[in-house]
């Protein structure tokens, strides 16, 4: 019976943990920038801990910007694009209390089970700079839990960048 309770606690913890971690995508922009005058862009830099992810981030952003009608050029574009990707470790503690609390006689079965879950969070930040004024005109960021499978993480990256650029260029 104790093993059943232990497995149930783990199943509940896993269900809550999975539901709690979803993509967090945010965007912000310079409200004075005239996005109608921007048509070309070039890559200034892409920095990630893993060199394989540099081209993946670049490809995802290229796809999103080109879908909006922007054209990539080698240099001297209207906008310079920079991106940074990072991974950090996260730990979550969840405690479940078994048994029933007592009113008068102290209850019974008071056991607590604490589970620790370690996971990694991946974050990507994309910045767009006006090349004339050298000022930041748009920023998008996304964070999500990472899988142990690179193809799943690449799919998450593509979805995150699509969400970032969903309402791009911003309306005034």
Where in this protein do the model-derived segments appear?
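A structural "domain/chain start" motif
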Residues: 21-68, 76-79, 83-85, 89-92, ...
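Surface-exposed short loop/turn segments
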Residues: 68, 83-135, 143
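Positively charged n-region of N-terminal signal peptides that target proteins for export
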Residues: 1-6
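Short helix-to-loop capping/linker segments positioned immediately adjacent to catalytic or ligand/cofactor-binding
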Residues: 67-72, 149
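A short, structured loop/turn motif at beta-sheet edges
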Residues: 37-39, 72-77, 128-135
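Bacterial N-terminal signal peptides
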Residues: 7-19
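C-terminal/domain-edge helix-coil "capping" segments
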Residues: 22-33, 116-123, 130-138, 143-172
């Amino acid at each position: 019976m104790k093993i059943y309770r232990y497995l149930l606690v783990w199943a509940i913890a896993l269900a809550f943990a999975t539901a709690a971690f979803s993509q967090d995508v945010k965007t912000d922009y310079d409200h004075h920038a005239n996005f109608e005058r921007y048509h070309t862009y070039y890559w200034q830099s892409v920095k990630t801990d893993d060199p394989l992810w540099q081209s993946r981030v670049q490809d995802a952003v290229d796809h999103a910007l080109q879908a909006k009608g922007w054209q990539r050029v080698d240099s001297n574009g209207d906008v310079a694009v920079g991106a940074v990707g990072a991974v950090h470790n996260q730990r979550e503690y969840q405690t479940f209390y078994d048994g029933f609390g007592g009113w008068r006689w102290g209850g019974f079965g008071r056991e607590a089970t604490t589970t620790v879950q370690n996971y990694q969070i991946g974050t990507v930040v994309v910045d767009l700079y006006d090349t004339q004024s050298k000022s930041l005109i748009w920023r998008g960021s996304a964070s999500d839990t990472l899988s142990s499978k690179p193809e799943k993480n690449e799919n998450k990256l593509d979805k995150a960048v699509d969400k970032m650029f969903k309402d791009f260029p911003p309306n005034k």
